[in-house]
Amino acid sequence: MNNPIFLSGLNKIYSKFDIFFVDLWGVVHNGIECYSNSLKALKNIEKRKKIILISNAPRPSHSVQKFLNKINFNKKFYNLLITSGDLTRFYLKNFSKNKCFYHLGPDRDKSLFINLGLKKTSLNNANFVVCTGVNNNKDSLSKYVPILKKIKKKNLKMICANPDLIVHRGDRTEYCAGSIAKLYEKMGGKVKYFGKPYKYFYEYICSVLKKKYRKNINKNKILVIGDNLNTDIFGANNFKVKNLFIAGGIHKSEWNKKNTNLANFVIKKNKDFKINYFQNELVW
């Protein structure tokens, strides 16, 4: 297995690729503000190339765009935004036979269910559960054990609209829907995940691109850029495309606080994940 290559700048390799799948949280922003170097890098990518923002946000892309506008990240920086929420909606609309669901998550994610012909109901009347995250950003996982036990007792299938386990909002760590779903699985519950790192998320993205641009997608020309080994990089591995690992994102504390050499950390992780390129932060 080849060792990962450190990039002093994206400009060293960007000519090899035509499509860039760029993660948002941890690469473009930290939940509060954008990273200036990341914006400069995206600005420098030629217009003939495509920048596709992909996110495990459990909401439709138009809802995420409103948040991006608030942190001054507008549409001129990219061609398309696709979320795990978009794929979840596609599944619920086209493949879900059951119509009554229980929503396990905050009200801010309710846009996920608009115009799907589904009925939000109590747990007692639900046919399945859709999990979008914790109700309060400060919640611990233990708070959800009682409701998960009730869901398991009814033997309901859970749809997880965000496979991420945690996220860093500024300097604070918060649990995501993926952590609740994993806890439910440990109880013996059945979960279907939508988003990174699952192959069908990338297949869905490529189908959207093919329809929009009316041409076949060459996977050899795709570069995935992300900071999460378990979702972004593993997802690139699953889809068999090249990747650029941003080590200064969600995994930063694993090497930075331990005074571990970045290159040694990445090489060690390369035993479990195939990492092609890496940077501390996305830099042109």
Report each predicted region and the residues it spans.
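Asp-based, Mg2+/Mn2+-dependent phosphohydrolase catalytic module
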Residues: 1-22, 30-33, 39-43, 66-79, ...
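Receiver (REC) domain active-site loop signature in two-component systems and cognate sites
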Residues: 26
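Substrate-engagement module of ASCE P-loop NTPases
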Residues: 45-47
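N-terminal phosphate-binding loop and flanking beta/alpha elements of the actin-like ATPase fold
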Residues: 50
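Canonical radical SAM enzyme core domain
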Residues: 57-61
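Polytopic endomembrane small-metabolite transporters, centered on the Drug/Metabolite Transporter
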Residues: 83-85
